């Protein structure tokens, strides 16, 4: 007669408690990479939006492995990353209790999608945010005070961060409210950082100026929400035997009689998903350029490779499910990342210095799949589908000449 195994290690990690809904929607950077003054001034993080997944084919270049010189199919995630707009500078001074904000300077002009973030109901508001801050840039006394503030930053501050926001008008979303974030500047002296930030106020910063191909980065995001779940789904506890009274997907014992309370380490039902998570060491397989004009023509071959020279875009046939088309710059990351489609993703430079062969391997893609993600896709491009299917009714109706209505 069979019975369940009573002794087993605990299920679930206690380091992520409490398992409750995150109070922030955008991933927060809690630790920044160590500053290196010998390098040029650069941003250490970027914001993007998860579009979807596809797969690639490449040849492995890691001598000594059995799979070296062999082709490998890998899943990748596409994160759309339109240029960020720099709208402010923040200086921090070092105190015995840590960093303290010293000065915050905003740009003269802030777009409506940025100012919307400071209102709960933009339509009913008076829309007067930053009107006083902007006046400082227009009169002589205000300009003198701004120069004094920038000089004080160079003299007293130890850490310089810039305030950036995303451009929602470039994305296929209904949302108009931009996401705003402070991003730390690393490299160079404090004076060079302040000058870098001052020169880029109200200007766009593209993703290829922050990251590069083959770089290892960290991904910070809020996971996909699953709602209220039981212990078997939430903690992966073992199901009880079939004849158990009052249910199988439960915990048989929730603790001893005394202490007369349920311990915090006992698996219980509750919220699953929508947790703030940081995933380390994601490799960038490609930084693609969005649709752009060259010699009067629209260039959209950001999914072509040296082996597959087909003129095709990274957007699959029919668009990414629940997202749409990717028309801006994008970052292709190996594997999956946290969050659902359209979720804002924080990309941060790695905190570690990588020396492994896998991290230093040069990635050369042979093929990027662009078939439809709504089913079992067969065609890579719309032209390939039309050549195989032949003329369809909708194409014949377009080519049919218009008949006059006069008899």
Swiss-Prot record:
Biased composition (Basic and acidic residues): 394-407
GO molecular function: RNA binding; structural constituent of ribosome
Gene Ontology process terms (BP): translation
Gene3D superfamilies named among the record's database cross-references: 3.30.1430.10, Ribosomal protein L3, domain 3, Translation factors
Keywords tagged on the record: Ribonucleoprotein, Ribosomal protein
Region of interest: Disordered: 1-35, 383-407
Amino acid composition bias (Basic residues), ranges on this chain: 1-31
Stored InterPro entries: L3_arc_euk (IPR045077), Ribosomal_L3_dom_3_arc_sf (IPR044892), Ribosomal_uL3 (IPR000597), Ribosomal_uL3_CS (IPR019926), Transl_B-barrel_sf (IPR009000)
GO cellular component, one term: cytosolic large ribosomal subunit
Keyword Ribonucleoprotein attributed: yes
Disulfide bonds: none
Function text: Heart- and skeletal muscle-specific component of the ribosome, which regulates muscle function. Component of the large ribosomal subunit in striated muscle cells: replaces the RPL3 paralog in the ribosome in these cells. The ribosome is a large ribonucleoprotein complex responsible for the synthesis of proteins in the cell. Inhibits myotube growth and muscle function.
Oligomeric form and interacting partners: Component of the large ribosomal subunit in striated muscle cells.
Family membership noted in the UniProt record: Belongs to the universal ribosomal protein uL3 family.
Protein known as: Large ribosomal subunit protein uL3-like
């Amino acid at each position: 007669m069979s019975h369940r195994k009573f002794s087993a290690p605990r299920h679930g990690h206690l380091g992520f408690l409490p398992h409750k809904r995150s109070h922030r929607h955008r991933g927060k950077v809690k630790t920044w990479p160590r500053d290196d003054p010998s390098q040029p001034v650069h941003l250490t993080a970027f914001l993007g939006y998860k579009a979807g997944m596809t797969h690639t084919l490449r040849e492995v270049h890691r001598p000594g492995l059995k799979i070296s010189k062999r082709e490998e199919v890998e899943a990748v995630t596409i994160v759309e990353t339109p240029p960020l707009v720099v709208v402010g500078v923040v200086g921090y001074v070092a105190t015995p209790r840590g960093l303290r904000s010293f000065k915050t300077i905003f740009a003269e002009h802030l777009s409506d999608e940025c100012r919307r973030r400071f209102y709960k109901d933009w339509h009913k508001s008076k829309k007067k945010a930053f009107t006083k801050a902007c006046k400082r840039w227009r009169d002589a006394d205000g300009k003198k005070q701004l120069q004094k503030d920038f000089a004080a930053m160079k003299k007293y501050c130890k850490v310089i961060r810039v305030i950036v926001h995303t451009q929602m008008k470039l994305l296929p979303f209904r949302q108009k409210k931009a996401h705003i974030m402070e991003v730390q500047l690393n490299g160079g002296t404090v004076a060079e950082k302040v000058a870098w930030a001052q020169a880029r106020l109200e200007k766009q910063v593209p993703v290829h100026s922050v990251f590069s191909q083959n770089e290892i980065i960290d991904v910070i995001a809020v996971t996909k929400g699953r709602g209220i779940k039981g212990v078997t789904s939430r903690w992966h506890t073992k199901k009880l035997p079939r004849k158990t009274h009052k249910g199988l997907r439960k915990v048989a014992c929730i603790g001893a009689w005394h202490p007369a309370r349920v311990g915090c380490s006992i698996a219980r039902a509750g919220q699953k998903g929508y947790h703030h998570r940081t995933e380390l060491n994601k490799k960038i397989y490609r930084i693609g350029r969005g649709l752009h004009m060259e010699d009067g023509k629209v260039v959209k071959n950001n999914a072509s490779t040296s082996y597959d020279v087909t003129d095709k875009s990274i957007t699959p046939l029919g668009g990414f499910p629940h997202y749409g088309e990717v028309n801006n710059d994008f970052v292709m990351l190996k594997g999956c990342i946290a969050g659902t489609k359209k979720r804002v993703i924080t990309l941060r430079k790695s905190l570690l210095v990588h020396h492994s062969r896998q991290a230093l391997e040069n990635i050369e893609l042979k093929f990027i799949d662009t078939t439809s993600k709504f089913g079992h896709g067969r065609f890579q491009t719309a032209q390939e589908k039309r050549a195989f299917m032949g003329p369809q009714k909708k194409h014949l109706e377009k080519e049919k000449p218009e008949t006059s209505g006069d008899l």
